[in-house]
Amino acid sequence: MRILQETSLAAFHTFGIESQAYALIEAESVDDLLLIWRDKQYQTLPKLVLGKGSNLLFCDDFSGVVVLNRIKGITVNETQESYLLHVGAGEDWHGFVQWTIEHNMPGLENLALIPGCVGSSPIQNIGAYGVELQDICQYVDILNIDSGEVSRLSRKECQFGYRDSVFKHELKETHIIVAVGFTLKKEWEPKTTYGPLAELNKTTVAAIDVFNAVCRIRQSKLPDPQVLGNAGSFFKNPVITQSIKDALLYQYPQMPNYKVSNLEYKLAAGWLIDQCDLKGMQIGGAKVHEQQALVLVNTGNATARDVLLLAQHVVNAVNDKFGVLLEHEVRFMGASKETTLSEVLA
């Protein structure tokens, strides 16, 4: 456990917006986490566990303890059919994906270059290019803060949904993810039907080819947080009913849409925003990225309020034009707890 002297949060979330915490502590084990939660100095203070802070906007100074999860380690077992990986929550996600490719354990390559740590991947049920975490997650190990016990949730118990899981709801305040288990099948089948990956030859493509293609695509479309502060996709792709989809298609026949179920369809939030001519739109130091409308960026001097006002402008514009209400994928953190766009701007 390491207590950091610096309490600025700018370097610990990818938006890079200046805000302060009461305390910043690195935890490298379950014992470290328990020590922090049971320390009388911090016991009554709000606490927030962070990995890379890649899906978060601090809307205010945080009045409590920000705990940086640095639990590391990768353990591999195998069966005749699969590799079974047990991974510490503090491992860098892209570094882990790269590790699996280097060790000839494909299956995660479509999820390359997603920022964040392994422990945050189940919270959002991260996904990209036709693959979601739930497709390869076997279990999630969680620490019960009150009892100090570590238990294991099966994939089903994680209640995965679109950018959603039980960790955003019932377990949000009571448990901490400490490790994630993955099952990677030895008989690898490439997932190349989504977007530009369809150009790859499915019969000859190797996992490293998919990995490299995904990295190229993401680097060409998404800004580097080291250059322009951002949290990746700011909004969820909205899911609508078939009747609403049909009505919109009548008016906008070129509108991308993807079938989710017999009754629901997913729209591309980036396309909706782009149709509102919002690329390059700027409020203060916050801006809609000029290449990818789904991303809001910190041009260098943005405040949290700049980002919030810009996000609300985008939501209003899309709702006015399409009658579709965008939800933010990025988590908003207030002074003591998580909040929402509507709450923070009320």
UniProtKB/Swiss-Prot annotation:
Gene3D superfamilies in alphabetical order: 3.30.465.10, UDP-N-acetylenolpyruvoylglucosamine reductase, C-terminal domain, Uridine Diphospho-n-acetylenolpyruvylglucosamine Reductase, domain 2
Similarity field: Belongs to the MurB family.
FAD-binding PCMH-type domain boundaries: 17-187
The protein's role, per its UniProt record: Cell wall formation.
GO terms under cellular component: cytosol
Annotated compartments: Cytoplasm
Source organism (scientific name): Photobacterium profundum (strain SS9)
Name of protein: UDP-N-acetylenolpyruvoylglucosamine reductase
Cofactors: FAD
GO BP annotations listed: cell division; cell wall organization; peptidoglycan biosynthetic process; regulation of cell shape
PANTHER family on file: UDP-N-ACETYLENOLPYRUVOYLGLUCOSAMINE REDUCTASE (PTHR21071:SF4)
